[in-house]
């Protein structure tokens, strides 16, 4: 009987905690396609290899303070470049010249604005810095339809397990 009460109490307590005290977070992703075309405007193997190298360079420079400060200025944010960098994750899927820019925020509109603005500022700033052609916006950021965290189910199950452990102790 105490086992069941502990199970339910733990589940309810941690589930309620996650529902009322942990702000939901949202993610939005924009994608850039990085390819370099030769002077004759025909993409060849050398251009594709250069595009792959440029993608890795872009990935490193995207979170540099000049780009982040441009995002801060454009969106009138009250944060530092170091703080803003934590809102972004960059991913370059294997064997592609695609660069995924994912922004995370407690506001779905802000997540979309961050990802979209970062992509636009990268397209504008990085080619001049690197003396290359601008990447193409392959996918604009979109408004997230659902939260990515917290998982209420996960917290409820963990709470139930903690309730069982406390009862067993």
Segments from the language model and where they lie:
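Hydrophobic and amphipathic membrane-targeting/association helices
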Residues: 1-169
């Amino acid at each position: 009987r105490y086992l069941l009460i502990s199970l339910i109490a733990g589940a309810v307590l941690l589930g309620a905690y996650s529902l009322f005290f942990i702000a939901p977070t949202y993610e939005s992703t924009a994608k850039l396609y990085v390819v370099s075309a030769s002077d004759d405007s025909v993409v060849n193997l050398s251009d594709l290899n250069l595009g792959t190298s440029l993608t890795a360079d872009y990935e490193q420079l995207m979170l540099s303070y000049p780009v982040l400060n441009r995002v801060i200025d454009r969106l009138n944010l009250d944060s530092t470049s170091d703080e803003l960098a934590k809102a972004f994750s960059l991913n370059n899927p294997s064997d592609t010249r695609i660069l995924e820019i994912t922004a995370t925020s407690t506001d779905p509109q802000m997540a979309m604005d961050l990802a979209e603005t970062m992509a636009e500022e990268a397209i504008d700033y990085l080619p001049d810095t690197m003396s290359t052609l601008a990447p193409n916006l392959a996918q604009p950021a979109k408004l997230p339809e659902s939260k990515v965290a917290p998982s209420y189910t996960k917290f409820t199950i963990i709470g139930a397990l903690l309730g069982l452990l406390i009862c067993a102790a």
